[in-house]
Amino acid sequence: MPFDPAASPLSPSQARVLATLMEKARTVPDSYPMSLNGLLTGCNQKTSRDPVMALSEAQVQEALAALERLALVFENSGYRSPRWEHNFQRGAGVPEQSAVLLGLLMLRGPQTAAELRTNAERWYRFADISSVEAFLDELQQRSADKGGPLAVPLPRSPGTREQRWAHLLCGPVDAGRSNAGVEPVPAGVETLQERIGTLESELASLRATVQWLCQELGITPAPASMPQPGLPAGNGSPGS
């Protein structure tokens, strides 16, 4: 039977870990499967996240263990250090397009169909807003034998024209709280946030690689604050 959130709802930290794996698999494939350090950075990044979280390494490990029991993630044993992959599409029994929409809803909170189409640009290219709405409707009408509904439309907030959607992977949604303080983000800012998020993830992957190389070679990495050769300690500027 596919994953049933009504029977085993995800915690916010589990949803963040799962959705981060889903995101990075598509947007930063060179860093996937993900190391624990890379995953921690991706979960806590300040761009493309609502809410922004500050998970600890222990919380990420606990979330991974719980998700593994639900068959939604698994550890890839083909690497020297542990790396993780998601199994959401198969575990939840949904098509690729629906998995993309649910991943975005887990990462960014409630969104309109138009916002989802824009935010999905680096994940999957939907032909139009109507196709996004069709998959959202399918998620809402999902039958009980398939695990029940996975998405729900929210009541329109005063002064808004478009309906927003929320996922149900963490259980029922508090529509009042979900509609509080909604402000649209300009498209240019969204693009910049995506680029910053990608750079943060790539930097975390590079740090993990350097750490592993230093361990293999028996080298202690120098702190970033150490003065450069030929420069006096202090402000580090010539002639100071």
From Swiss-Prot:
- Write out the similarity annotation: Belongs to the UPF0502 family.
Q: What is this protein called?
A: UPF0502 protein Veis_2102
Among SUPFAM superfamilies, the record links this protein to: Winged helix' DNA-binding domain
InterPro entries in the record, alphabetically? DUF480, WH-like_DNA-bd_sf, WH_DNA-bd_sf
